[in-house]
Amino acid sequence: MSVVEQAQRARTAAAELAVATRSVKDAALHAMADALVARTPEILAANGADLAAGREGGLNAAVLDRLALDTGRVAGIADALRQMAALPDPIGEVVRGSTLPNGLELRQVRVPFGVVGIVYEARPNVTVDAAGICLKSGNAVLLRGSSSAAQSNAALVAVLRDAVAGAGLPADSVQLLDATTRDSVKELMRARGLVDVLIPRGGAALIRTVVEESTVPVIETGVGNCHVYVDAAADVSKAVAIALNAKTQRLSTCNTAESLLVHAAVADAFLPPALAALAAAGVTVHGCPEVARYSAAVLPATDEDYATEYLSADISVAVVDSLDAAVAHIRRYGTGHTEAIVTDSQPAAREFVARVDAAAVMVNASTRFTDGGEFGFGAEIGISTQKLHARGPMGLPELTSTKYVVTGDGQLR
């Protein structure tokens, strides 16, 4: 089936989803979760085939880890669907309302986008997360995953479609594009009028391609070159702990710190313990000459290092002589995802927050907190680094648009 034909089916399903009640959608989410657990063996068999092909094809260990499923991971994915069912339904929520002077009742209410396209890499969990959050928000979804996860995604979507249909909603609410070729992505990007919004999740090259070539409106999710700035007024022990957590708690996420900026006034106190802690965690430091004075293990940092989202056990480190210099560095190299300051100075914190342009700004906290679950939003589809339509963690409300409902009693203009 062509992408256009699948998009047309999704559009038909979206019309039914738009008027589905919360109880029906939540029942479908629970059915999806139960089916995943019940059919775990066939899911793992498909995943095993993908893993074998990936090893033979030379996929690196990090990609294989993201691709891999086991009984525990499938159970966790199912639990995430149950948690989505417990979240409030955004559809029909009144964003604002008033009675106009002429007596008209005006309400702005949330409505689904309609059809959401998701383009993503080798993460089978995204297949289920995206299907769940789109269904809960009343949207049909077209999924285009990586060819390296083709069998896993096919098995997962088959399970989800059966569960959705069994709960009384259209199976075409959840579809996996039949083709995993680059042409299928191009067709999806050109399906304006059938697909309402396209969300890319993955590396910089994937996101750039979709943003630059799509005629369907795109919500850009986050490449993250996140910084931690250790201010002159920082508590050194707190700063070391935050920097270490931001870099090492999980290496391959978009909210992982990739660069560390240190005010010259605290370099002597901060850098020796920080570099030792990073080295003990297996992190390679790429630093400026000032940083290299504190450790022979520091590699020279290039301009490319400061611009790189490593997603690995590497970090760039630079000494700066002022908050101004830190902000200038972030403006040059940051991606607008998450930036952090460690300081005991409220004026410095306020200035940093005001001047840094990012989806999230942390004060005395790890960059790793930029996450829908950590923010208390529940499920998220990604972290938007653009300013339209959404910014930051994208939960259920961010997968909606609004319309105005005006109720009168015969008023004429």
Curated annotation (Swiss-Prot):
Known EC number: 1.2.1.41
SUPFAM superfamilies given in the database record: ALDH-like
Presence of keyword Cytoplasm: yes
Catalysed reaction equations from the record: L-glutamate 5-semialdehyde + phosphate + NADP(+) = L-glutamyl 5-phosphate + NADPH + H(+)
Enzyme class: oxidoreductase
Record GO biological process: L-proline biosynthetic process
Main location: cytoplasm
Residues making up the signal peptide according to the UniProt record: none
GO molecular function terms listed in the Swiss-Prot or TrEMBL record: glutamate-5-semialdehyde dehydrogenase activity; NADP binding
Parts of the chain that traverse the membrane: none
Keywords carried by this UniProt record: Amino-acid biosynthesis, Cytoplasm, NADP, Oxidoreductase, Proline biosynthesis
Pathway field: Amino-acid biosynthesis; L-proline biosynthesis; L-glutamate 5-semialdehyde from L-glutamate: step 2/2
Compartment(s) of residence: Cytoplasm
Keyword Cytoplasm: yes
GO CC terms: cytoplasm
Similarity comment: Belongs to the gamma-glutamyl phosphate reductase family.
Function field: Catalyzes the NADPH-dependent reduction of L-glutamate 5-phosphate into L-glutamate 5-semialdehyde and phosphate. The product spontaneously undergoes cyclization to form 1-pyrroline-5-carboxylate.
HAMAP family: ProA (MF_00412)
Protein name: Gamma-glutamyl phosphate reductase
Organism: Salinispora arenicola (strain CNS-205)
